[in-house]
Regions:
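Bacterial N-terminal signal peptides that target proteins for export
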Residues: 2-15
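Sec/Tat signal peptide C-region and signal peptidase I cleavage site
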Residues: 24-28
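Carbohydrate-interacting regions of secretory-pathway proteins
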Residues: 29-429
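Bacterial N-terminal signal peptides
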Residues: 13-23
């Protein structure tokens, strides 16, 4: 009896030891919590392990898409499609390190998108937001291009095959995106598999030669919501956390080089060209609206430029604008117009119209047929303009504050317009 009891005691002791070890391991691997060091370093959770607080539908106010919480994980039910099933954060992020664990079902397809811009004109988030691709390559039913595989910057940059160590479906992987003022890194299970610089000439060439050639605003935003994708396959996510990085301001940018239109895109059939070191905009035979827009976004900035109205001077400088379709550019316009028509005022295109016009007594500040100096300062929801050293407007507007986009020069419709520009110089804020 003693022998049997001793054996039983030893067995119980072993089981207790194993249970204790398992318990310690579980505690050590507690999910959806931050360590003291992570908190001190500025990390924050985007998922609390219990609820979907902080998330909502893309372009929505509440969450109705196919997502739920199961056993401390966000799960995509697999009911989504290319056109639906997107869940986004209720906050925007600019520069950051984003880390998360993910697990796919057999043949699964999902993704993590960032810098997603929400507008009624955009039915799906991938029109604007870059995507870290997640896919079960060995079991996916269709042939995949390299830019469609796990870890890719979807339809843009492919990961280094020699560094790929993705675990099979049903097992957890960890991924990380670093976005630091245009420098981008993709990580997978502790290894850096991809890095590139956004918004360079090479980046724009790649963007305009592939899938995104017909998506003019893809990847341009410096700030946006983070998005999870249900692409019709169950997928699980946990330990979603982010550390925000500082913006590098004070960058000096010469928007026009005096030689060509590098860094700009023209929309419409009106004429934009360089002559004698000047940027010229001139009405074409169609006599329609025309725009010359920067390829890159500038949200907070201080811009100075000079313009001269050589013919009808109905033009303008758009701020935080975007290409909606064809030659339609949407945004806010700092007016450039003949005397008596509010040069320096702010007009919202395809929206509320005039937000602020200039007093009649300030109309004589414009020098028609001569060079004028305009300054535009945009910071948050505040816009200030100056003409020839005199302040014209100072306005705060919440809708402008939520905007983001390009700088664009405009030719008004009606024909007979010719305006020349020079010394377009910008400082980021």
């Amino acid at each position: 009896m003693y022998f049997r009891g001793t054996t039983f005691s030893k067995r119980v002791s072993v089981l207790l030891a194993v249970a204790l070890l398992v318990g310690v391991e579980c505690m050590a691997q507690k999910h959806n919590v931050l360590t003291a060091k992570e908190k001190a370093d500025g990390w924050e959770l985007l998922f609390d392990g219990k609820t979907l607080n902080g998330w909502r539908d893309y372009n929505g106010k509440t969450l109705t898409e196919p997502w739920h919480v199961v056993d401390g994980c966000i799960q995509a039910k697999g009911d989504g499609s290319d056109a639906s099933g997107y869940m986004v954060t209720d906050r925007e992020f600019e520069n950051f390190i984003l880390s998360w664990d993910w697990k796919l079902s057999k043949g699964g397809n999902s993704g993590m998108l960032y810098h997603v811009v929400e507008r009624p004109q955009y039915a799906v988030p991938y029109i604007t937001g870059p995507e870290y691709q997640l896919i079960d390559e060995p079991n996916f039913p269709e042939k995949l291009e390299e830019w469609q595989k796990t870890g890719a910057d979807y339809a843009m940059h492919v990961p280094d095959k020699s560094k790929m160590n993705v675990r099979p479906y049903g097992e957890w992987n960890n991924s990380r995106i670093v976005f630091d003022n245009g420098h981008v890194e993709h990580w997978l299970n502790g290894k850096k598999i991809l890095e590139f610089e956004a918004w360079t000439d090479e980046w724009h060439k790649l963007k305009n030669s592939g899938k995104w050639a017909t998506a003019p605003e893809y990847g341009l935003a410096h700030k946006g919501v983070i998005c999870l994708q249900d692409h019709g396959y169950p997928a699980s996510f946990r330990n979603i956390k982010i550390k925000q990085l500082p913006r590098k301001s004070g960058k000096q940018v010469t928007l026009f080089n005096g030689k060509n239109l590098d860094g700009w895109d023209a929309y419409g059939t009106e004429r934009w060209y360089v002559e004698d070191g000047l940027l010229v905009c001139e009405s074409g035979p169609d006599k329609q609206y025309g725009y010359l827009a920067t390829r890159n976004y500038y949200d907070d900035f201080d811009l100075t430029l000079e313009f001269k109205q050589e013919a009808d001077g109905n033009s303008g400088v758009f701020i935080r604008s975007f290409v909606e379709e064809g030659a339609k550019v949407n945004g806010w316009q700092v007016e450039v117009a003949p005397k008596g028509y509010d040069t320096g005022g702010i007009y919202e295109s395809y929206g509320r119209g005039w937000l602020i016009q200039i007093p009649d007594e300030r109309e004589n500040i414009l020098k028609e047929g001569e060079w004028n100096t305009m300054r535009i300062r945009v910071k948050g929801d505040n816009v200030q303009t100056w003409l020839n050293g005199e302040q014209m407007v100072n306005i705060n507007d919440a809708k402008i504050g939520a905007g983001k986009g390009r700088i664009a020069l405009q030719i008004h419709d009606g024909g007979g317009i010719k305006v020349v520009w020079r010394n377009l110089k910008l400082t980021t804020l």
